Amino acid sequence: MAFNKEQFIADLEAMTVLELKELVSALEEHFGVTAAAPVAVAAAGGATEAAEEKTEFDVVLKSAGGNKIAVIKEVRAITGLGLKEAKDLVDNGGVIKEAAPKDEANAIKEKLTAAGAEVEVK
């Protein structure tokens, strides 16, 4: 009988959580490995390196400032949101763009700051 991936997946889907746990334990014992996620073993210096290597940033609107209409227009241009959604975002604050490259995040911040908003890049 040939190995059939679809049948194997169907068999896994039919198993209970307890049966899956026992299967994982048996596989760990058989192959001499663990399924636990590796914990960061690096010293405190490793955290500093990770912060320096950050390539994606979130652009967060803190407040609209005095010129709310201009900020709403910029938010609409940047995000492509409708008028109501952009207004709600400007009124409540929040993430304008997630996981943006550094250059793009800074450009968005400059545009919104020029419109009068208070923006933070995280």
Swiss-Prot record:
GO terms for cellular component: cytosolic large ribosomal subunit. GO terms for biological process: translation. InterPro entries: Ribosomal_bL12, Ribosomal_bL12_C, Ribosomal_bL12_C/ClpS-like, Ribosomal_bL12_oligo, Ribosomal_bL12_oligo_N_sf. It holds the Pfam family Ribosomal_L12. GO terms for molecular function: mRNA binding; structural constituent of ribosome. Keywords: Ribonucleoprotein, Ribosomal protein. The keyword Ribosomal protein applies. It comes from the Bacteria. The keyword Iron does not apply. Belongs to the bacterial ribosomal protein bL12 family. Homodimer. Part of the ribosomal stalk of the 50S ribosomal subunit. Forms a multimeric L10(L12)X complex, where L10 forms an elongated spine to which 2 to 4 L12 dimers bind in a sequential fashion. Binds GTP-bound translation factors. Forms part of the ribosomal stalk which helps the ribosome interact with GTP-bound translation factors. Is thus essential for accurate translation. This is Large ribosomal subunit protein bL12. It comes from Fusobacterium nucleatum subsp. nucleatum (strain ATCC 25586 / DSM 15643 / BCRC 10681 / CIP 101130 / JCM 8532 / KCTC 2640 / LMG 13131 / VPI 4355). The gene is rplL.
